[in-house]
């Protein structure tokens, strides 16, 4: 039986499994200071054209979101996100449990607009009792979104411009980023590094056993980030297992190949549904498909 409920029902791609087996008995330093993590960082910096970025490897998406937001925000600040966002709907209140409110914005397709962000922040700042309300200080978007939709390059550029004008931090959750990169008109890794304060490159949903690579451009977020990783339970002792996987994913374009295959396979499913007259809840070009059930 073929199952379709998520991106992580199998183990890892053969290239990663082979390297894990080949290097299994090597002895390296722990906690991400090994040669494999260093090599992976350099490959990602090159791919992003971001040689001033700090790169950290974490095990999963919720852990990455929690750690980044904790590092970026002060206690009185919150993060704006779509009402369907992963940090709002699928992380068991992890962000709020550690002291930061998720400020939700309305959405019809999983995306939020620069105009809505700007309007919310300006309303907050115009409120005479603003200091009694959580201060909006970060914008969180995922690429793709929870509905499978994607931000185009112009949309992300507009969000980035508004965030910079208003002094907000822009954070992109890239748990499914390889699929977005395979879609036409979407921001590249170099665009993300240019437009965002921080983002991460998902591995768990794209052929790795586990792992997300956090790319930090904002110097304020870089400060003491490893302390914050450790405090939030994210300092993986056998860190080389993360580095080795990302080193493999960024060898010979493997990360991009995986995303293209995922999107292509989903396209076959989409076409089969459409041939039967079945419609979709959202206009998703990625591998997240939401067919609307029909009765005959």
Residue ranges and their predicted role:
Residues 2-294:
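Conserved PLP-enzyme active-site core in the AAT-like
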């Amino acid at each position: 039986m073929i199952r379709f409920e998520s991106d992580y029902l199998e183990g890892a791609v053969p290239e990663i499994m082979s390297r894990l087996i080949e290097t299994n008995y090597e002895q390296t330093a722990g906690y991400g200071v090994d040669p494999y993590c260093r090599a992976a960082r350099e490959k990602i910096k090159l791919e992003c054209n971001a040689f001033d970025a700090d790169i950290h490897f974490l095990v999963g998406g919720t852990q990455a979101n929690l750690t980044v937001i904790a590092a970026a925000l002060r206690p009185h600040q919150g993060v704006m996100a779509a009402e369907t966002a992963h940090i709002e709907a699928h992380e068991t209140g992890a962000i709020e449990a550690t002291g930061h409110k998720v400020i939700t914005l309305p959405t019809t397709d999983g995306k939020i607009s620069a105009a809505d962000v700007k309007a919310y922040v300006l309303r907050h700042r115009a409120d005479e009792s603003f200091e009694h309300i959580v201060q909006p200080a970060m914008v969180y978007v995922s690429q793709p979104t929870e509905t499978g939709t994607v931000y185009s390059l112009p949309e992300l550029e507009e969000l980035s411009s508004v965030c910079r004008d208003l002094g907000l931090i822009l954070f992109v959750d890239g748990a499914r980023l390889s699929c977005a990169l395979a879609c036409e008109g979407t921001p590249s890794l170099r665009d993300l590094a240019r437009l965002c304060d921080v983002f991460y490159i998902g591995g768990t949903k794209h052929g790795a056993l586990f792992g997300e690579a956090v790319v930090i451009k904002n110097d304020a977020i870089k400060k003491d980030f490893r302390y914050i990783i450790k405090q939030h339970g994210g300092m993986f002792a056998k860190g080389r297992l993360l580095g080795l996987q990302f080193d493999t994913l960024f060898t010979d374009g493997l990360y991009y190949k995986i995303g293209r295959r995922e999107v292509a396979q989903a396209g076959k499913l989409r076409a089969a549904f459409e041939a039967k007259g079945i419609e979709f809840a959202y206009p998703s070009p990625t591998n997240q498909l939401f067919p609307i059930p029909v009765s005959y």
